[in-house]
């Protein structure tokens, strides 16, 4: 379906307004909501295209600027070494509590909209995969998709590099989908095994999917992009969202 991608909101948080971009079907109606958390580069072209694709399948998609208190509104970091260095510096400058507050604010923004059914999911990529994992600890989140989520295995998200994401994994009550590239140096085999073992330990409802891909294999810019793998994994994501958000999970 065709979409609208021109809606911008400044969502209130205790650390200042969080610029948030909304993508939605053009047709009037009520739709499930999805928060898309970006990579360390913020709301880039590839992130916008991912949001548009999800919206075109019948969802309201909110994309917040993850570094809104550290970067000017509208700032996009380049896919180069300088951009990566700045994005990683920001990742470790921001307080863990601020990441969590931002997630709650983005979810609340969707839920209060008249065009939202109130059924909510999250998806994230790289840094955003970890943010989606933490956002799923909110009881309103029925489904979460984490693409090669960084820092979960090492517990190093946020200022001080000491998060409690694995410790709190048992708080996630919705359905999880974790997607990994086996050639991703940011989350090696040992790290992936640590995450999976913890999810098994807390009896999480999750699907685990590993592919022969590099870090950033779904980003449709650069030499690591693998279109075949990307579309395959997007299919898994949409299947989860359709079952849990659009059609409704009878268990919830």
Q: At which residue positions do the language-model features occur?
A:
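N-terminal cap/leader regions of alpha/beta-hydrolase-fold enzymes
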Residues: 1-252
């Amino acid at each position: 379906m065709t979409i609208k991608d021109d809606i911008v909101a400044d969502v209130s948080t205790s650390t200042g307004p969080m610029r948030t971009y909304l993508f939605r079907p053009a047709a009037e109606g009520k739709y499930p909501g999805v928060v898309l958390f970006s990579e360390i580069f913020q709301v880039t072209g590839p992130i916008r295209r991912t949001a548009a694709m999800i919206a075109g399948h019948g969802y309201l998609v909110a994309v917040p600027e993850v570094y809104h208190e550290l970067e000017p509104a509208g700032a996009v970091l380049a896919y180069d070494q300088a951009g990566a260095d700045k994005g990683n510096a920001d990742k470790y400058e921001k307080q863990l509590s601020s990441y969590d507050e931002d997630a709650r604010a983005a979810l609340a923004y969707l839920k209060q909209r008249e065009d939202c059914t109130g059924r909510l999911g999250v998806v994230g990529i790289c840094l955003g995969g970890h943010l989606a994992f933490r956002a799923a600890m909110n009881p309103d989140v029925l489904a979460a998709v984490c693409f090669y989520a960084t820092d979960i295995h090492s517990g190093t998200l946020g200022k001080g590099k000491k998060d409690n994401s694995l410790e709190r994994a048992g708080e996630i009550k919705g359905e999880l989908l974790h997607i990994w590239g086996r050639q991703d140096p940011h989350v090696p085999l040992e790290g992936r095994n640590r995450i999976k073992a913890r999810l098994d330990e807390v009896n999480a409802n999750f699907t685990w999917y590993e592919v022969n891909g590099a870090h950033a294999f779904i980003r449709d810019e650069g030499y690591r992009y693998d279109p075949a793998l990307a579309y395959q994994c997007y299919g898994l994501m949409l299947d989860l969202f359709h079952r849990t958000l659009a059609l409704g999970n009878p268990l919830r």
